Amino acid sequence: MKYRKRGWPSCWWPRAAVLPMRRQGVGGAEKIVRIADISGFTGALGKTAEAIETTPAGVEKIVLVGVGEPGKLGNDDWLKIGGAAFSQIGNAERVTLTLALPETTIAGDEAADVALGMVLRSYKFDRYKTRKSEENGEPKHAAKITVCVADTHSARKAFEVAEAVADGVIQARNLVNEPANILGPVEFAEEAEKLEKLGVKVEVLGEKELKKLGMGALLGVAQGSVRPPRLVVMEWHGAKGKEKPIAFVGKGVVFDTGGISIKPAANMEDMKGDMGGAAAVTGLMRALAGRKAKVNAIGVIGLVENMPDGNAQRPGDIVTSMSGQTIEVINTDAEGRLVLADALHYTNDRFKPRFIINLATLTGAVMVALGQYHAGLFSNDDELADQLYDAGQSTGEKLWRLPLGTEYDKMIDSKFADMKNSAGRYGGSITAAQFLKRFVGETPWAHLDVAGTAMGSPANEYNQSWASGFGVRLLDRLVRDQFES
């Protein structure tokens, strides 16, 4: 993505960015007004209008992209503009996107967000298709895109950060989209190890080490699969001195059949995405390292497969977690919280972080409560919860806080152990969060239930993928706004 300086043209449509896609030549500003008038283009956010002209210099396609009311743009609107623009590129070889608005200066970070929206919209996961663009009518090549904006210096600088974040989102999407026969716990860990090239310290703990640590909850989930579990620890040291780290923990169930409490066959294929939390944490660590974030950050992901073989754990089993707390397994399909129990305690005990945020595709109940446009937010710390909420509003990866309380906590008490892993039908996402809360002590903590947003969420202008990469941009924004020194 290149940036080029562009002054204010003498004639312009006041609510549109312009995308001339051409072999040669540049259309005059007067064409823009004419296209808008003829097409009835209103400039509504994300709407487009286009015209194709044949000139002595070649063929030119001009596209107008609506930006809505400039003074009201916010959240992820600039990403939507970029995504809408990219959707119109087609087979153009060279593209120039001119960003300019009347009586308004487009800031460098806004221009970078437009470019980020284009990058995210360009993503597709088609590595297993043997016949690609020919049958889908997709471009056979990548267009060379130049973004014209008044302040090129700040735009380029902002895009260096945005590009690193895009790399993190794309990695998260790739991991979630990958089929489970290709991506098991070992293979996922190998992908995380590649972050060492960016300066991330990566440590992979195998089954022997996990047994030595006493991670009975995580190992109980893994024991039904022939694929061995892994716990991956990623460390990024970007702050000066010995500043306490911030920590992110992800659930990484690479495939979830439900175990002995097996799921229905319908839509079980989607459970290849039950590691969306671990994917987001891995993508976040890539983003932080890629942009050289000035913070010390820890990413921990627990990687298992939940299968129903003769050695699988049973309903009624009691396991001992690394914390020493015992858990009665009521439902083997409530396995993610068992993985997180040990991962959370390990992270808290080893690193003593300033806070812990965990991400997990944990419950279907959160989708019943919130649908697929908000992730569930639970926290024992109001300040952290508010910071996360604000980051969600800024990025468009929105959160909605749900309650915790002693009444819900009592629902997971067990007659035979310290707690049980399922409290039944009602308040399912809340009781799951209460379960996790028992493993973080007094450390500020937040749990993001991303079951409805990490995979299969509705497409938008900058995401047409089944896997969204939800959480990477959200948490990167949180780190930038609140915790970088």
UniProtKB/Swiss-Prot annotation:
Entry cofactors: Mn(2+)
Gene Ontology CC terms, in alphabetical order: cytoplasm
Signal peptide: none
Active site, renumbered: K263, R337
Name used for this protein in its record: Probable cytosol aminopeptidase
Main location: cytoplasm
Localisation: Cytoplasm
Any single Pfam family the record assigns to this protein: Peptidase_M17_N
